[in-house]
Amino acid sequence: MNTDDANIVDDKACQLESWVKSTRTSLERWAIPGCNFGGELEWSVGGNNQTEDTVGKTQFWLGQVKKRWVPVGENTVGISTTLGTMVTRPAMGSQPEDKDYYLNVPVTVPLGQDRFVHLNAGWVNHQTLGTNRPTWGVGGELPLTARVIAIAETYGEAAMGTRYQLGLRMWLVPQRVQIDTTYGNRIGQPEHERWFTVGLRLLSPAFLP
């Protein structure tokens, strides 16, 4: 999901989030590892390799830190803050790198029986464009079985349109190995902007010193 939750990876543990996103004209391959070394902080560094029919290959690199202020509980709303940066390296060497800085505040509201609503409010600074824009997201999780979860979200950035995703998550190994698949599009746009994703998430037990 693009809409983040307020949780972080377990203390002294790590995770790897990876996925492939396919559209009619592009293919993205993402991998973002993250670890919690303590202090209720999750550090992540990763990126993608993207191929587009019209511009060739583009790379994205990101680094971020997520601070959890209030853990999500059975009757407790969780709150976190994320600060990060993303660097875009265009396929055409004549174009300069683009760098964005972003802030996001994820809030997770528990509804009981492992049902959750996630609310995001944020801001992004596009260095090359010289603009600042608000960002937002609303997402939800609904368990269908002990291992299968339905997910849905809508999110956007000011002046960039509203997008949505629908999909499923499945635990292959509870709390350790999860796969997911989604379908998404931009609201009011033709089919050529739609996308499909397939993802894999790996979570480790605590092992860091």
Predicted regions and their residues:
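Transmembrane beta-barrel domains of Gram-negative outer membranes and organellar outer membranes
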Residues: 1-209
